[in-house]
Swiss-Prot record:
Entry-linked Gene3D superfamilies: Ribosomal protein L17
Summary of subunit composition and partner proteins: Part of the 50S ribosomal subunit. Contacts protein L32.
InterPro entries from the UniProt entry: Ribosomal_bL17, Ribosomal_bL17_CS, Ribosomal_bL17_sf
Matches recorded under Pfam families: Ribosomal_L17
Key words, A-Z: Ribonucleoprotein, Ribosomal protein
Family: Belongs to the bacterial ribosomal protein bL17 family.
Name of the protein in its database record: Large ribosomal subunit protein bL17
Length: 129
């Protein structure tokens, strides 16, 4: 039975919550790592993981479903050309949520949300001489 398995409301209206989760999922799929609060991160996982599962099988119906959920052509392209093949053999668990301390001001628990197996980017430090 699925009693009590509803969504977190996050103190927002349903339209605001939908828009916020859509924006956060687009940012995560574009940058592959974002920083947010822990409850938002846990809700974001319920949105992004099915999207990546859609991206594993590239057909027109799945592309239309992904566009309906993201409303961004560039994200849909990346989802089906990069992320789908990257996670083709992984049966779920595409996100990693790391606790990241507490926010100054309201002491909200923060978290880093990142895609598992993302390519490491070498950061070049700019040295001022």
């Amino acid at each position: 039975m699925r009693h009590g398995n509803g969504l977190r409301k996050l103190n927002r209206t349903s339209s605001h919550r939908l828009a916020m989760l859509r924006n956060m999922s687009n940012s995560l799929l574009e940058h592959e790592v974002i920083k947010t609060t822990l409850p938002k991160a846990k809700e974001l996982r319920m949105v992004v993981e099915p999207l990546i599962t859609l991206g594993k099988k590239d057909n027109l119906a799945n592309r239309r479903l992904a566009f309906n959920r993201t409303r961004d052509r560039d994200i849909v392209t990346k989802l089906f050309t990069e992320l789908g093949p990257r996670y083709a053999t992984r049966p779920g668990g595409y996100l990693r949520i790391l606790k990241f301390g507490f926010r100054h001001g309201d002491n909200a628990p923060m978290a880093l949300v990142e895609l598992v197996d993302r390519p490491e980017v070498e950061e070049t430090a700019v040295v001022a001489e």
